[in-house]
Amino acid sequence: MLRILGRRVVSASKELTSIQQWRIRPGTDSRPDPFRTFRGLQKGFCVGILPDGVDRNSEAFSSNSIAMEGILSELRSHIKKVLAGGGEEAVKRNRSRNKLLPRERIDRLLDPGSSFLELSQLAGHELYEEPLPSGGIITGIGPIHGRICMFMANDPTVKGGTYYPITIKKHLRAQEIAARCRLPCIYLVDSGGAYLPKQAEVFPDKENFGRVFYNESVMSSDGIPQIAIVLGSCTAGGAYIPAMADESVMVKGNGTIFLAGPPLVKAATGEEVSAEDLGGATVHCTVSGVSDYFAQDELHGLAIGRNIVKNLHMAAKQGMEGTFGSKNLVYKEPLYDINELRSIAPVDHKQQFDVRSIIARIVDGSEFDEFKKQYGTTLVTGFARIYGQTVGIIGNNGILFNESALKGAHFIELCSQRKIPLVFLQNITGFMVGSRAEANGIAKAGAKMVMAVSCAKVPKITIITGASFGAGNYAMCGRAYSPDFMFIWPNARIGIMGGAQAAGVLTQIERATKKRQGIKWTEEEEEAFKKKTVDAYEREANPYYSTARLWDDGVIDPCDTRKVLGLCLSAALNRPLEDTRFGVFRM
């Protein structure tokens, strides 16, 4: 479960902090009500307000509730493990050196009572033979003096904070978000550098360790502040993170920066020197000039970090003012219980549900102005507000037909022209197939929607609420289409197709191959082949398989969806919005 933290780090078993920490003042919407006349005409008829849409007495509601509780229990268990970092002994060693844990460091940088949205909390889950909690690095967004920042904090309790391939991928993803949203970067450095046994996977390629420093340089040149606080070891290539930062802080005693540590220096030159004398805070703050601020201890260093952000002079921000909601912004809570999202979301992806029941529980006042409601009905499109910010919502209500794809492309064009952020609620098994669909140009219609999604320059946020299969993933702004943020519910599945469908296709191919080769294929062998295929697809479609590899930005409790969307919108709207130019639409 993606955690939204308050002033103190909370455990996975605790509830989220209250909505008051959001700095968005609740109240009655003071905007003119265009539906007031209609509401007076017919009792009980409210234009723009979604109905409840949920039968609480249905078997589906009950079974979904039970199934989701089991799924969330598994999620909480996984999160509890990663919150423990590298284990009790590693944490004790860290404490003995008067060092805070990475989430505690972030907590002390954040504004009091504010929220922190941690990204990719389960990165590296079961990816390697040895555990690598959170991929060895904590990343996320939160405010310092009202300015939303991107935090990247090495976890020294996990393999000494060294970089595995997934650590680098997670670090680069955080930088990608920061660059796009123009968020100041806060590097909390405590790392032994690259994990040497996997040097071939972390060092030489374009998206490897060197890309971290490249991104740091490019963001600095683009006016995006790069701030490093050295709280522990900063060795070899890792030394370039603070050296290339706009401003850097070093903590006395624990913070060190050197290209080669004492053992390597002795081996290479014969010189015997301590880590502090070789590259400690005194050396780099008074002699070399590598660092700019000398901190007596961690708390002092983190306080200096807050002051650096306070003194940033950046251009005026857009939209929600970068404070997770303007203090003067007025919004309405949804009319319906957001906790019911746990009972709406099906575990069986063959079970249909109306995406409007999700929309009604995540948008302000459950108000939704639907666009083209009677046309292309398997795709729901319309305008709403989330914490006062206008958004365009695109949600699946079945497979995509020609009409629904054209409707989606039209709506994306509208939002792009008006610079309205897009929220995709993805539950899609694909496009319609068959001779009639092909003759009607399903590929052409789908291409229009994919073109629109690809070219749209407005902020795009994707939530996978159920299935995410095949080309439907593409049209609904999957990972390849660079959404600003993308999260996944724990009941979701993502893959090129469902396991049963894949087994059917591959079985036909295998049967034909064996027939050509003159090999007899028994019924038992065929069933075993099918089972093996289904099992493989189910394993690889699992949300934990996805999130471990950073195919998304985190697995979230459905009940957190509204809060996560609000935080993501706050971050995404820090950047100036560009005009959109579309490619050639095949008519």
From Swiss-Prot:
Q: Which Pfam family is one of this chain's hits?
A: Carboxyl_trans
Q: Name one GO molecular function term.
A: cobalt ion binding
Found, by tissue, as follows: In roots, cotyledons, leaves, flowers, ovaries, siliques and embryos.
Pathway(s) this gene product operates in, as recorded in its UniProt entry: Amino-acid degradation; L-leucine degradation; (S)-3-hydroxy-3-methylglutaryl-CoA from 3-isovaleryl-CoA: step 2/3
For this record, the Gene Ontology CC terms, alphabetical, are: mitochondrial matrix; mitochondrion; plasma membrane
Start and end residues of each stretch annotated as Acyl-CoA binding: 367-396
Q: Which UniProt keywords apply?
A: ATP-binding, Ligase, Mitochondrion, Nucleotide-binding, Transit peptide
Catalytic activity reported: 3-methylbut-2-enoyl-CoA + hydrogencarbonate + ATP = 3-methyl-(2E)-glutaconyl-CoA + ADP + phosphate + H(+)
**Could you tell me which PROSITE patterns the record lists for this protein?**
COA_CT_CTER, COA_CT_NTER
Example GO BP: L-leucine catabolic process
Which residue interval is the transit peptide?
1-26
Q: Where is the CoA carboxyltransferase C-terminal domain?
A: 333-579
Q: Where is this region: Carboxyltransferase?
A: 68-579
TM stretches of this protein: none
- EC numbers for this chain: 6.4.1.4
The enzyme class is ligase
- Compartments reported by the entry: Mitochondrion matrix
Q: Which InterPro entries does this entry report, sorted A to Z?
A: AcCoA_carboxyl_beta, ClpP/crotonase-like_dom_sf, COA_CT_C, COA_CT_N, MCCB/AccD1-like
Positions of the CoA carboxyltransferase N-terminal domain: 68-324
Q: What does this protein do?
A: Carboxyltransferase subunit of the 3-methylcrotonyl-CoA carboxylase, an enzyme that catalyzes the conversion of 3-methylcrotonyl-CoA to 3-methylglutaconyl-CoA, a critical step for leucine and isovaleric acid catabolism.
Miscellaneous comment: Temporal and spatial accumulation of the alpha and beta subunits during development at approximately equal molar ratios.
Question: How does the record describe its quaternary structure?
Answer: Probably a heterodimer composed of biotin-containing alpha subunits and beta subunits.
The family this protein is said to belong to: Belongs to the AccD/PCCB family.
What protein is this chain from? Methylcrotonoyl-CoA carboxylase beta chain, mitochondrial
Question: Which organism is this entry from?
Answer: Arabidopsis thaliana
